[in-house]
């Protein structure tokens, strides 16, 4: 099962036949295992990894560190559940260290993300502080390099 998950992480579009060959299983066994993983919630989604820097559309991504006061009943879970329901929040993690939650937030521009942080996120009871960091460039995402070797080639300049 771990080998199948590794294959799917590397290429979610791999055919049942190719996965079966690599794992020395039958396509039917691979299909049944994938079905079981989906039903148990192990496989949550199949997504494309997109190089946002190559798209024409403007999209702003920010990492937001959030300090919160944990609740007596439920700790961080209640406030985390509330925050992750916002559509702007694409990913969210409970962290160790100087802040409690790490959010990845997306919006059409800096102002929209800043307004989300100042008007919506900071006003939630229990949120005691935030620090926002805007993504400038992505070099690697989910194990995938965003530039090939020749993307960075520069023209030689001679005097």
Residue locations for each model-derived region?
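A compositional/biophysical signature of low hydrophobicity enriched in polar/charged and small residues
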Residues: 1-159
């Amino acid at each position: 099962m771990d080998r199948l998950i590794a294959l799917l992480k590397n290429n979610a579009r791999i055919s049942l036949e190719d996965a079966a060959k690599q794992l020395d299983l039958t396509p039917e066994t691979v299909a049944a295992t994938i079905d079981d993983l989906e039903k148990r919630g192990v496989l949550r989604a199949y997504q494309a990894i997109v190089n946002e820097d190559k798209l024409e559309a403007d999209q702003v991504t920010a990492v937001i560190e959030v300090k919160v006061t944990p609740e007596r009943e439920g700790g961080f879970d209640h406030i985390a559940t509330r925050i992750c329901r916002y559509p702007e929040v694409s990913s969210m993690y409970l962290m160790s260290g100087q802040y409690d939650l790490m959010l990845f937030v997306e919006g059409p521009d800096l102002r929209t993300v800043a307004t989300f942080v100042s008007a919506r996120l900071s006003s939630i009871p229990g949120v005691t502080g935030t620090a926002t960091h805007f993504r400038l460039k992505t070099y690697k995402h989910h194990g995938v390099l965003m530039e090939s070797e020749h993307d960075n080639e520069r023209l030689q300049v001679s005097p």
